[in-house]
Amino acid sequence: MERFLENAMYASRWLLAPVYFGLSLALVALALKFFQEIIHVLPNIFSMAESDLILVLLSLVDMTLVGGLLVMVMFSGYENFVSQLDISENKEKLKWLGKMDATSLKNKVAASIVAISSIHLLRVFMDAKNVPDNKLMWYVIIHLTFVLSAFVMGYLDRLTRHNH
């Protein structure tokens, strides 16, 4: 009975495979939205105010960071929790594949969330005159919460690595 349960639990990790594939579909959706934004901006580029262009560029950077986060979670999560990626020798392989454990992934995700939050906060500040003060305050508090969380996770990771 114990062997059956252990084998069933171990095999259940494959339930995550379609979830990671779903993230790749989300990446396709994000790429479509990215290029939709570019196509929307190009005809108006010469009539746009500089601040509006900067807001669009920040949105594009934001989408790029989210895309990188998706790729990192897809590949690292799959390798850590489902199976090793079998990439042929003659194909280009990302250097970090197979080297990022769950803790490293968690720290990278936290750093990415802080970067994404920073971009979002910058966009909000560029339009600060149209945003109520209490809403600005909450944006800053939420961002600082992300920063503090990422810092604490990194610090705790350093402590546990130092003690082992």
From Swiss-Prot:
Q: Which InterPro entries match?
A: UPF0114, UPF0114_bac
Tell me the compartments it is located in.
Answer: Cell membrane
Which top-rank group of organisms is this from? Bacteria
This protein's membrane topology, according to the annotation, is: Multi-pass membrane protein
Q: Does the keyword Transmembrane helix apply?
A: yes
Q: Which GO terms describe its cellular component?
A: plasma membrane
User: What stretches pass through the bilayer?
Assistant: 10-32, 53-75, 136-155
Query: Which keywords does this chain's UniProt record carry?
Result: Cell membrane, Membrane, Transmembrane, Transmembrane helix
* Classification via PANTHER family: UPF0114 PROTEIN YQHA
What family is this protein classified in?
Belongs to the UPF0114 family.
Instruction: Indicate what this protein is called per its UniProt record.
Output: UPF0114 protein YqhA
